[in-house]
């Protein structure tokens, strides 16, 4: 997702059908080049979300994991809106683990 796409999404602007078709074609080509099945991509998405959720609270409904192709290079892009960090919770877990280990 480019900066322009993000701004358009925030402002509620609709994409032109040609732009939408181009984006879909790029997605199909990216899937084809990487040889990733949709099931594998969904599994990767779930695992990425669960790992990130250990450290920050994310907005799963607004988040997206996708393949993007630019200049003949395909990238896995995770766009995950962060609601808040869980650093306080992590510190508590670390202290709990340390005190259990010292017993």
Swiss-Prot record:
InterPro entries: MinE, MinE_sf
One GO term (biological process): cell division
Keyword Transport appears in the UniProt entry: no
Keywords annotated in UniProt: Cell cycle, Cell division
A Pfam family it matches: MinE
UniProt key word Cell wall biogenesis/degradation: no
Family, similarity comment: Belongs to the MinE family.
Role this protein plays: Prevents the cell division inhibition by proteins MinC and MinD at internal division sites while permitting inhibition at polar sites. This ensures cell division at the proper site by restricting the formation of a division septum at the midpoint of the long axis of the cell.
NCBIfam families: minE, PRK00296.1
Protein name (Swiss-Prot/TrEMBL): Cell division topological specificity factor
Organism (species): Prochlorococcus marinus (strain MIT 9211)
Gene that encodes the chain: minE
């Amino acid at each position: 997702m480019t900066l322009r796409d993000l701004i358009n999404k925030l402002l509620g602007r609709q994409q032109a059908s040609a732009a939408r078709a181009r984006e879909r074609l790029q997605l199909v080509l990216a899937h084809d080049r990487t040889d990733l099945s949709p099931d594998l991509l969904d599994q990767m998405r779930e695992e990425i979300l669960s790992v990130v959720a250990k450290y920050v609270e994310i907005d799963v409904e607004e988040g997206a994991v996708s393949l993007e192709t630019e200049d003949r290079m395909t990238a896995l892009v995770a766009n995950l809106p962060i609601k808040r960090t869980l650093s306080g919770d992590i510190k508590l877990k670390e202290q709990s683990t340390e005190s259990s280990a010292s017993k």
